[in-house]
C-alpha cells in the first residue's frame, strides 16, 4: 500500500509534494475551537475523549493538512506519578508540589499511562475511527527533560535555575528522576501507538536552555533510551516514525542526530538547509517557518515559505511546519492559504 505523503517523508521517501501540518493546528485561532473553549476548561477538553477527538479533527476539516495531531497536553502525564497540576488564568500550568529534593523524587508513584492518561488513549481511538484512511495521526509526549523542568520549577521558567541546580548538585537524584520520566514517556508513546497513532513526536520545549555539554551528559541518553524503548516495545514492524523537536537547539543540531529519531524538528532560528546539513542526510527534517510570520501580509508569508521550500531543494524527507506552535492571533485564512501554497509550490518541483 502506498504510504501517505507525511509518512513517506518521515522515511525520506519521494512524495508528490511536500507534506504540511502545523504544531498547535487545533487551537485558539480557530473559531470552532473557541466555541468549545467558552464552555469547558482546558484540562476538561483534554480529559474528555469526545471533545479531544472533535478538536483534533477541526483542522482536518478546515485545511488541506497532511496529518492530524491528537489534541492533548504534555503535563497530565505528571499527575499520574503524584504531581498536582492546575492551569491558572494568566499564569499557565502550575505544579503545586514541585520536586526540589531527592526525597521528593523518591516519593513519586509508579504508574501505567494506559490508566493515568487513558482519556488521551481513548481520544486516539476515536480519531482513528473518524479519520479512516484520510490522514495519519500523530501522537506525542513531552520529552523527559521538559517534563522534569516543569516538575522541578513548578511551572514555566525563563532560566530554569532550580532545574539546573538539582541537576548539578544532586546528579543521582537527577538520574533517578529522568529514569522515572523515561519509563513514563516510553510507556505513554507505546500506548498511543497501540491505540492507532501512526507517528509520535517528542517535544523538548526547554532543552535549548542547556549548554551543549549539559545536554549531552544529562539529557541526551534519556532521549535515546525513550526512542529505543518505543521502537522495541510498540509491536509494530517497521516501527512508526519518531519525531524529536527541541526549541532553541540550533547550536546542538549535530548532536541531535545521536538521538536516532527518524525526523528532527527545526525551529526558525536557522536556515533549513543549514540545519539539515548539521543533522545529516540520514534524517528527515520538519519545519521551520517562524509562527509569527503568519501575522504578516500574505505576500510576506508566501515569500518566506517559498524560501524554506527552495532550501529543501526537493530532497525527500522534508515536512513543512512552523518552528513552534501557531499563535492565537493567526488569521485562519492564512493557515489555509499556506497549506495550499506548500502543496502547489512544491508539486512544481521534481521529488525523486
Swiss-Prot record:
Which InterPro entries does this chain map to? UROD/MetE-like_sf, Uroporphyrinogen_deCO2ase_HemE, Uroporphyrinogen_deCOase
Q: Which GO terms describe its cellular component?
A: cytosol
Q: Which Pfam families match?
A: URO-D
Output the superkingdom of the source species.
Answer: Bacteria
For molecular function, the Gene Ontology terms on record are: uroporphyrinogen decarboxylase activity
UniProt KW Magnesium keyword: no
Compartment(s) of residence: Cytoplasm
Sequence similarity: Belongs to the uroporphyrinogen decarboxylase family.
Give the species this sequence originates from.
Answer: Roseiflexus castenholzii (strain DSM 13941 / HLO8)
List the residue ranges forming a coiled coil, or say none. Answer: none
Question: Which EC number(s) are documented for this chain?
Answer: 4.1.1.37
| Catalytic activity, reaction form | uroporphyrinogen III + 4 H(+) = coproporphyrinogen III + 4 CO2
Q: How does it assemble?
A: Homodimer.
A Gene Ontology biological process in which this protein takes part is: protoporphyrinogen IX biosynthetic process
Q: Tell me which Gene3D superfamilies the record gives.
A: 3.20.20.210
Query: What CDD domains does UniProt report for this protein, alphabetically?
Result: URO-D
PANTHER family the UniProt entry points to: METHYLTETRAHYDROFOLATE:HOMOCYSTEINE METHYLTRANSFERASE RELATED, UROPORPHYRINOGEN DECARBOXYLASE
Which protein are we looking at?
Uroporphyrinogen decarboxylase
- Binding locations of substrate: 24-28, 73, 150, 205, 324
- PROSITE patterns xref list: UROD_1 (PS00906), UROD_2 (PS00907)
Record-marked site positions (Transition state stabilizer): 73
Q: What does this protein do?
A: Catalyzes the decarboxylation of four acetate groups of uroporphyrinogen-III to yield coproporphyrinogen-III.
The biological pathway it contributes to is: Porphyrin-containing compound metabolism; protoporphyrin-IX biosynthesis; coproporphyrinogen-III from 5-aminolevulinate: step 4/4
Amino acid at each position: 500500500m502506498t504510504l501517505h505523503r507525511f509518512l513517506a517523508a518521515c522515511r525520506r521517501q519521494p512524495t508528490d509534494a511536500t507534506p504540511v501540518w502545523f504544531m498547535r493546528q487545533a487551537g485558539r485561532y480557530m473559531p470552532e475551537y473557541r466555541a468549545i473553549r467558552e464552555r469547558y476548561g482546558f484540562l476538561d477538553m483534554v480529559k474528555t475523549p469526545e471533545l479531544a477527538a472533535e478538536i483534533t479533527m477541526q483542522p482536518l476539516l478546515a485545511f488541506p493538512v497532511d496529518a492530524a495531531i491528537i489534541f492533548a497536553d504534555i503535563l497530565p502525564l505528571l499527575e499520574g506519578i503524584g504531581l498536582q497540576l492546575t492551569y491558572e488564568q494568566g499564569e499557565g500550568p502550575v505544579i503545586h508540589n514541585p520536586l526540589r529534593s531527592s526525597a521528593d523524587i523518591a516519593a513519586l508513584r509508579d504508574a501505567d499511562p494506559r490508566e493515568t492518561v487513558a482519556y488521551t488513549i481513548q481520544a486516539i481511538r476515536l480519531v482513528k475511527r473518524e479519520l479512516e484512511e484520510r490522514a495519519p495521526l500523530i501522537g506525542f509526549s513531552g520529552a523527559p527533560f521538559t517534563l522534569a523542568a516543569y516538575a522541578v520549577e513548578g511551572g514555566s521558567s525563563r532560566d530554569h535555575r532550580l532545574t539546573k541546580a538539582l541537576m548539578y548538585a544532586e546528579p543521582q537524584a537527577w538520574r533517578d528522576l529522568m529514569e522515572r520520566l523515561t519509563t513514563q514517556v516510553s510507556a505513554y508513546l507505546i500506548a498511543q501507538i497501540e491505540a492507532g497513532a501512526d507517528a509520535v513526536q517528542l517535544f523538548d520545549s526547554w532543552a535549548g536552555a542547556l549548554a551543549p555539554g549539559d545536554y549531552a551528559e544529562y539529557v541526551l541518553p534519556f532521549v535515546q533510551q525513550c526512542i529505543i524503548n518505543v521502537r522495541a516495545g510498540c509491536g509494530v514492524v517497521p516501527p512508526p516514525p519518531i519525531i524529536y523537536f527541541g526549541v532553541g537547539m540550533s547550536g546542538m543540531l549535530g548532536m541531535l542526530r545521536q538521538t536516532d529519531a527518524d525526523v528532527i524538528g527545526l525551529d526558525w532560528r536557522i536556515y533549513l538547509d543549514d540545519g539539515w546539513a548539521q543533522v545529516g542526510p540520514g534524517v528527515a527534517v520538519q519545519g521551520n517557518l517562524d509562527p509569527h510570520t503568519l501575522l504578516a501580509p500574505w505576500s510576506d508569508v508566501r515569500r518566506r515559505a517559498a524560501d524554506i521550500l527552495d532550501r529543501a531543494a526537493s530532497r525527500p524527507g522534508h515536512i513543512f511546519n512552523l518552528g513552534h506552535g501557531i499563535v492565537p492571533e493567526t488569521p485562519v485564512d492564512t493557515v489555509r492559504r499556506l497549506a495550499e501554497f506548500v502543496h502547489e509550490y512544491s508539486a512544481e518541483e521534481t521529488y525523486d
